[in-house]
């Protein structure tokens, strides 16, 4: 075969392959367009599909064209109504685990914030964990000295419940070293307290935008709940303290609508001390169980009505629930006065169940270790010592810390009552352990119709970290 014949042969073969390739593409397109849509189980090629995720991540509009998806991210629409939250609390026979973030364990090798004061609050579509960061990460040099409560680096951030407080999923909420947050059914309201001790300011955010402020009125570390505020029929309530931590201070209850303060009242409580209230809605009122950091080992109780009238006293039960505290057998209880002579304290909570009360407390009487929740018959109204239920959440070999309350709204549960829930903070690092940092993780429990076995859902991180050995 001469060279010209070889060229002609190669060219003919190449041309044949090109024609065959074109025919194969035509067949493929014909099958895709004509045959596949004929199957009743598949949507048409150019159908637009709206996918709404039950979380605050995104809503997608997916336009399907042949084998290509075009995804457009849409802004989540506002709910068109406020949550009611006037229902009574559901009766709880026990508390089942809802979530656990394991933030410190993950943070030994992950990008997790150094935090304290975590708490949970829920909207009609989700629950979120809020926390106060220290503007630093675990196992990093900036974590040094984070045992300090107040600094210009502290911020309120949040993640979806169960997620660790990591840099990739956290959402900024407010600049704050003290905070509260709640959802009215339409938008989140957050309140962050920041600034110098003598002139601190609380900034109210609604839907992520600053909408109002509260300036310190007593000039002594204005502070708030470190747990969920409470919204009832579109109006949101919270409690603030300004004044000494170890003697008489000043206390106020506030009410806001869509981020604007519409009312406040001074709470008269001579001889009593109120800090870090854990509040929840119940039968149209706000019920709070707080911390007495002055003398009482029983907890203050504050019940706020929609018109901001209130009743204030102490949890009646004949068992103390603050830490440090004395022996149960030596405690008598009082509905009106602080009992015991133990200064300091720890944030805690309680739930009214008719005349009974569920009350959480550390297992240790002297330190923030272990955690249990007790049900005391008639403990909301009498100095009763009759303990009818007890559940251990963290054993006494492991550290606990703050604890607080929130409820699951009926929009989430589809029940006709509000599910009582609580969280327990588990503090690690300074001052109890040999580290340069202080941080915490949390376990969250919700009321159920069954008794739940004792167990220890403790933090579990192995300390010290690498940064502590340098």
UniProtKB/Swiss-Prot annotation:
GO terms for cellular component: host cell plasma membrane; membrane; virion membrane. Residues 89-470 are annotated as: Head of neuraminidase. Its cofactor is Ca(2+). Residues 11-32 are annotated as: Involved in apical transport and lipid raft association. N-glycosylated. Inhibited by the neuraminidase inhibitors zanamivir (Relenza) and oseltamivir (Tamiflu). These drugs interfere with the release of progeny virus from infected cells and are effective against all influenza strains. Resistance to neuraminidase inhibitors is quite rare. Residues 32-86 are annotated as: Hypervariable stalk region. Residues 1-14 are intravirion. Its EC number is 3.2.1.18. Disulfide bonds join 90-417, 122-127, 182-229, 231-236, 277-290, 279-288, 316-335, 421-446. Coiled coil: none annotated. The active site is at 149 (proton donor/acceptor), 402 (nucleophile). Intact N-terminus is essential for virion morphogenesis. Possesses two apical sorting signals, one in the ectodomain, which is likely to be a glycan, and the other in the transmembrane domain. The transmembrane domain also plays a role in lipid raft association. This is Neuraminidase. It comes from Influenza A virus (strain A/Herring gull/DE/677/1988 H2N8).
């Amino acid at each position: 075969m001469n060279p010209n014949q070889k060229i002609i042969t190669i060219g003919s073969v190449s041309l044949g392959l090109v024609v065959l390739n074109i025919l194969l593409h035509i067949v493929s397109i014909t099958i895709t367009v004509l045959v596949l849509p004929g199957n009743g189980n598949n949507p048409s090629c150019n159908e637009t599909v709206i996918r709404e995720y039950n979380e605050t991540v995104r809503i997608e509009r997916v336009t399907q064209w042949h084998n290509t998806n075009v995804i457009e991210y849409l802004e989540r629409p506002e709910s068109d109504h406020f949550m009611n939250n006037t229902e009574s609390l559901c009766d709880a026979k026990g508390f089942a685990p809802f979530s656990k973030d394991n933030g410190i364990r993950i943070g030994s090798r992950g990008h997790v914030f150094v935090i304290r004061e975590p708490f949970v609050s829920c909207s009609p579509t989700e629950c979120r964990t809020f926390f106060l960061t220290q503007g630093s990460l675990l196992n990093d040099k900036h974590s040094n000295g984070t045992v300090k409560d107040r600094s210009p680096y502290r911020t309120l951030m949040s993640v979806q419940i169960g997620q660790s407080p990591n840099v990739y999923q956290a959402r900024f909420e407010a600049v704050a070293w003290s905070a509260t947050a709640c959802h009215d059914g339409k938008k989140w309201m957050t309140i962050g307290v920041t600034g110098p001790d003598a002139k601190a300011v609380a900034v109210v955010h609604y839907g992520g935008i600053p909408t109002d402020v509260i300036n310190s009125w007593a000039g002594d570390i204005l502070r708030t709940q470190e747990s969920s505020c409470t919204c009832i029929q579109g109006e949101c309530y919270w409690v603030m303290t300004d004044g000494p931590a170890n003697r008489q201070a000043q206390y106020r209850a506030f009410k806001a609508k869509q981020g604007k303060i519409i009312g406040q009242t001074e709470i008269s409580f001579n001889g009593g001390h109120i800090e870090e209230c854990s509040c929840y809605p119940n039968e149209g009122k706000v019920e709070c169980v707080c911390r007495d950091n002055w003398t009482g080992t029983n907890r203050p109780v504050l019940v706020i009505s929609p018109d901001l009238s209130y009743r204030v006293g102490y949890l009646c039960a004949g068992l103390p629930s603050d830490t440090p505290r004395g022996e149960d057998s030596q405690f008598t209880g009082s509905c009106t006065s602080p009992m015991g002579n133990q200064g300091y304290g720890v944030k805690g909570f309680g739930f009214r169940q008719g005349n009974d009360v569920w009350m959480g407390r550390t297992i240790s009487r002297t330190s923030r270790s272990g955690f249990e929740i007790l049900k005391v018959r008639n403990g909301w109204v009498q100095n009763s010592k009759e303990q009818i239920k007890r559940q251990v959440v963290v054993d006494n070999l492991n550290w606990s810390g703050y604890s607080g309350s929130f409820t699951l709204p009926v929009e989430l549960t589809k029940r006709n009552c509000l599910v009582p829930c609580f969280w327990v903070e588990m503090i690690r690092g300074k001052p109890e352990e040999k580290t340069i940092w202080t941080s915490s993780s949390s376990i969250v429990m919700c009321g159920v119709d069954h008794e739940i076995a004792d167990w220890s859902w403790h933090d579990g991180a192995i300390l010290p970290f690498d940064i502590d050995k340098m």
